[in-house]
Amino acid sequence: MVEPREQFFQDLLSAVDKQMDTVKNDIKDIMKEKTSFMASFENFIERYDTMEKNIQDLQNKYEEMAINLAAVMTDTKIQLGAIIAQLEILMINGTPLPAKKTTIKEATPLPSSNTNNEQSMSTYSSSISGKTSETVKKNPTNAMFFTRSEWASSKEFREKFLTPEIQAILDEQFANKTGIERLHAEGLYMWRTQFSDEQKKMVKEMMKK
């Protein structure tokens, strides 16, 4: 017969063993959860790195596109300014001459009254040929073939090919603009306010050719 004291210790040891088994099982479950969590976390890190790389690639592409777009817009604005300058000259002087490369010094000045394009003038007497004066048409539309920089910045160009009245209007309307931006704004203003329907039709027909 087992004594009460021995029975007590046996029961206590049995209870401790059961509790230890429970703790061991809990530890195993925790380790499994830890392993699963670490796998998920590593997968998350890989996905984050991939996402970060994709974002960086997109940012690089965006910056490259922004640079290309700025270059295209600048070139387009310059070309549009050149077209607007031609429209201004066309409105003031009528149908242009055949294309001819010239400079501002070679261009014929605009008549001060701007009445019509058929006004004549006497040519100078040639010291070589000895020709006498003859009547010729004054057609200053050679200015259409200036370089873009001359269109955008030449004060002499404005004085020669725009009447004082038009210059005054444009100076008042666009005093806060300069360069190509001002040329663009002036051209649009003149197209909308100064061109007749007939002139607009003629310009549109020319642009189709």
Curated annotation (Swiss-Prot):
Principal location listed in the UniProt entry: host cell
This protein's superkingdom?
Answer: Viruses
Question: What spans are recorded as compositionally biased (Low complexity)?
Answer: 120-133
The induction field says: Expressed in the early phase of the viral replicative cycle.
Give the Polar residues compositional bias ranges.
110-119
Q: Which residues form a coiled coil?
A: 13-75
So which residues are the signal peptide here?
Answer: none
Which Gene Ontology biological process is one annotated for this entry?
A: symbiont-mediated activation of host autophagy
Kindly state which keywords UniProt assigns to this record, in alphabetical order: Activation of host autophagy by virus, Coiled coil, Early protein, Host cytoplasm, Host-virus interaction
A GO CC term attached to the entry: host cell cytoplasm
Where does it live in the cell?
Answer: Host cytoplasm
Task: Please give the residue ranges the record annotates as the region Disordered.
Answer: 107-135
Q: What does this protein do?
A: Induces host endoplasmic reticulum stress and consequently activates autophagy and NF-kappa-B signaling pathway. In turn, may induce autophagy-mediated STING1 degradation and innate immune evasion.
Q: Which family does it belong to?
A: Belongs to the asfivirus K205R family.
Instruction: Return the protein name.
Output: Uncharacterized protein K205R
Q: Which organism is it from?
A: African swine fever virus (isolate Tick/Malawi/Lil 20-1/1983)
